Amino acid sequence: MLIPVAGLPELSWTHKPGAASYDASAGELTLTAAGGVDWSNDALGGPSQHEATSLGFDAPGDDFTLSARTRVTSARTTFDAAVLALHSDDDHWAKLCFEYSPAGQAMVVTVVTDRFSDDCNSAVVTGTDVHLRIARLGDAWAFHSSTDGVRWDFGRLFHLVPGGARWKVGFMAQAPMGDSCTAVFDRIALRHERLSDLRNGA
């Protein structure tokens, strides 16, 4: 079933179909992850995990930004997250997460995978939501977060080329340690622009 989201191209799942709904009047996209699902290519060589599924669209070839306000409305469990995701294949992907840490803190977490995952904790989030943004700059990508959707804090810049398929960019919920995770995305915006300065808050 196609899920049209205002302002975005047609969306499809990267893996198996997931649970999603869109409230057009509120501009809210809701994804619900099953228990035990995640994306992870263990840097220590352990088993990979690709049971989560992202709802996304073919990334524009030119520079762009995709942003959304994110929150998790279900009871929080370790490593659950609302995610902006970038995916080519299971060895080439990245995700920008509003994640719940083992210490019981909500925080921004970034993961970049080129065969193996490079995982990095970022800002602690004290509120119930956070704005996330992915920006394309040629073959490079930038991750930002914001408490208000106006001033953006730089999180990560990385170079990553696709694997066997072109990039898809979109939304995901994950619940690697819990029974489920419901993630809500609103204030969704796709802008065809290039960020001129990654560190000036714009």
Which residues does each PLM region occupy?
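Extracellular glycan-recognition regions
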Residues: M1-A202
